[in-house]
Amino acid sequence: MKLLKFGGTSLANAKKFLCVADIIEKKNKKEQIAVVLSAPAKITNYLATIIENKIDDEVLKKINLAKNIFIELIQDIKRIQPLFPYENTKSTIEIEFNKLKKIINGILLIKQCPEGIKPIIISRGEILSVDIMKNILQSRNHEVTILNPVTNLLSIGNYLDSTIDIKESKKRIKKINIDQKNIILMAGFIAGNKEGELVVLGRNGSDYSAAILASCLNAKCCEIWTDVDGVLTADPRIVSNTYLLDYISYQEAMELSYFGAKVLHPRTIEPISQFQIPCVIKNTNNTESKGTWIGKENNPSDNSLKGVTYLDNIIMFNISGSCLKDSGNTIARIFTILSRESMKIILIIQSSSENQINFCTFEKDIDYILLILKKEFTLEIKEGLLNDFNIVKNLTILSVIGSNISEKNNIASKIFSSLGSSKINVLAIAHGSSKHSISIVIKKENLLQGIQNIHNTLFFKKTIINVFLIGIGGVGKALLKQILKQEKFLDQKNIKIQFRMIANSKKLLFLKNSINLNNWEENFKKSKEKFNLTILNELLKNTCDSNSVIIDCTSDYILSKQYISFIKKGFHIITSNKKANTDSLKYYSEIRTTALKENKKFLYETNVGAGLPVINTLQSLFSTGDCLISFKGILSGSLSFIFGKLEEGVLLSEATKEAKKLGFTEPNPFDDLSGIDVARKLLVLAREIGYSIELKDISIEPILPERFKKYQNSEEFLFKLKELDSFFSERVNKARDIGNVLRFIGSIEKNGKCSVKIEEINSNNPLYKVKNGENALTFYTNYYQPIPLVLRGYGAGNDVTASGVFSDLLRIIL
């Protein structure tokens, strides 16, 4: 015997009803099947609104609407399965809804709805589901036995939330003679009290019915069919990268359900656990999925984690006072009164000082709990033995579930670390006595961030880097291409880079999970979200996961002034933008102080030498005790190209024009020939070495006369540049005559004196052969002398710069 239960989403329309019938038929070929059915999706909730709201003449219209849903359902079934007995089924539907109308008319006369009538109204959907399924199966030549839950399942409790007496129900069902070849059908959600009245079983009552019937029939397995593949590691609606759990124990399932997992209710697990009946969660829409099995305890050595859940709309009562100290009586009174009034207490946390206790409950009960506690402790409050109740609202409880979780190393520390990375405060923590759960209380506004962080840290097998990219010009686009190309390599290293935002100066593309890099340009063009700093800061406020990084591939000064704010929000910063590192020494220092305080990384390898490992090499050298003696370098790819062409006999104006055409220069080449860009790079190096200087402290010997500043138009500038062709040709020739070449060089002396100028160098100089856009940096240090440390390679270009940014990105997790 196997029991199958199908929920409302599995019976939402005609096609799904018939799909369920197919599953039943297939299973019935192997063994006898008992089936518990819910009402079609939304029907029970729809009928519940009738009894929850004021009952008036409008209710009859709602009854007709509900009836029409069923009529349309069986019409569709008839079209798909012609042998279905439509008229007989329609007649049953008419009879049931006529009963409802008579009940409603009676209620209208007496102006109230008796408690015993409410379950009759809201259970019509389940009863009709069974009749429809019976007719589908019989039209396919199957024998069907219908179990009446009112006469066979004895309930204890109120009309709308009863509990089943399993022992008595077993006796009743055992007396029924059911043919072995018959398919058994029973309406879920329904039972009967000792007076024989129909009652219902409360929230998730159909699942509970299924577990009870499985116990009564001694079923070898209870299959719960729903619209998900099984139990996932978290709610996929709010958490990315969830995955299906193959197996969980009864206790783990109980903890998951208690702390918010929506797949099963704790009451459902109790009977299958008591009678050791395996349970499997299956997907009606994906019958091939293996589902999640729920069974006996895991192997004691299995410490694997099973899920992270949440309960929201939580409040926390803080109760304090001298009467709590050394007095178990006061605490007992608190929880006795709450239990007597059926108030659900989710967590209890007692202060080590013994004069304070906290407990969490649902926000909807706040007023009533306050009322009964104030009434119970009127004297203590009046005498000052108990302080006014402090209530913290808008909270969420996050819980991590797993076998022997208390014995698993570092779980709590990992939870705190993952939340700390996004500056989420933990207000309280509780450890389950079963050793299967750890629960923490946080602010509701931090739910999405907190649960995603914890899940990524504990359950996702890869290290995730969340990227917010600003700037999609040449470097930004090249970076996206490189990361897409390296996806397989990253996957092998268990690294997942997720782009959450891509932006330029006008608009942005943002996704909660990850932007698909295969078609990001197409989606970016479709995006209508504008970009400005106000919008950006608002967006970043609640989106900082673990390892969240802002990458600045712009040259925007205003954006660079936001770095401290970004770091304080929990983001690492990677920038190819030199503006921050060449700003005032005060701002330069503040960024680093903030990054250190917030435990965030500020990386800028591409500020000097593009993809060359300049900054990282310097930091490694000086952190191991080396000291600079002197530095000389060619720091501009455009000037490296231009001066190399001069050496070959090309005129200055022609060399500059060619450099611009090849993309080496800025839009107006004056910016390159002014030497200011080289000075900025030199400033970055000098500060990295340890010199506290400003840009104005660097001596710049200009390549061009002052008058060339006024030519802001690049065409005009290049035309006027011809005036200097003969001067530079003559200077190049003079140097050549004695075996020298001209190079534009940045220098740092041991005393921190920095200069940028044209130098004439001979063939013994390491910079002699550097041209064609290459950069070269020579460091004379205590460790590297008399032969210097030389770093040489292309120091300009989108691909090499992007590779430097990519390298910094991987350093975030290394």
From Swiss-Prot:
Pfam family, one: AA_kinase
Region annotated Homoserine dehydrogenase, chain positions: 470-814
CDD domains: AAK_AK-HSDH, ACT_AK-like_2, ACT_AKi-HSDH-ThrA-like_1
Pathway listed: Amino-acid biosynthesis; L-lysine biosynthesis via DAP pathway; (S)-tetrahydrodipicolinate from L-aspartate: step 1/4; Amino-acid biosynthesis; L-methionine biosynthesis via de novo pathway; L-homoserine from L-aspartate: step 1/3; Amino-acid biosynthesis; L-methionine biosynthesis via de novo pathway; L-homoserine from L-aspartate: step 3/3; Amino-acid biosynthesis; L-threonine biosynthesis; L-threonine from L-aspartate: step 1/5
Binding positions (NADPH): V475, T554, S555, S576, K578, G797
EC number: 2.7.2.4, 1.1.1.3
Residues binding L-homoserine, per UniProt: E666, D677
Binding site residues for NADP(+): V475, K506, T554, S576, K578, G663, E666, G797
Gene Ontology biological process: homoserine biosynthetic process; lysine biosynthetic process via diaminopimelate; methionine biosynthetic process; threonine biosynthetic process
Domain ACT: 319-400
Cofactor(s) of this protein: a metal cation
Region (Interface): 249-469
Cofactor annotation comment: A sodium ion is seen in the structure; a metal ion may subtly affect the relative position of the nucleotide-binding region to influence enzyme activity, and could increase the stability of the enzyme.
Region Aspartokinase, residue ranges: 1-248
Active site, UniProt feature: K681
Catalysed conversion reaction: L-homoserine + NADP(+) = L-aspartate 4-semialdehyde + NADPH + H(+); L-homoserine + NAD(+) = L-aspartate 4-semialdehyde + NADH + H(+); L-aspartate + ATP = 4-phospho-L-aspartate + ADP
Its job: Bifunctional aspartate kinase and homoserine dehydrogenase that catalyzes the first and the third steps toward the synthesis of lysine, methionine and threonine from aspartate.
Protein name (record): Bifunctional aspartokinase/homoserine dehydrogenase
Organism: Buchnera aphidicola subsp. Schizaphis graminum (strain Sg)
Taxonomy of the source species: Bacteria, Pseudomonadati, Pseudomonadota, Gammaproteobacteria, Enterobacterales
Gene field: thrA
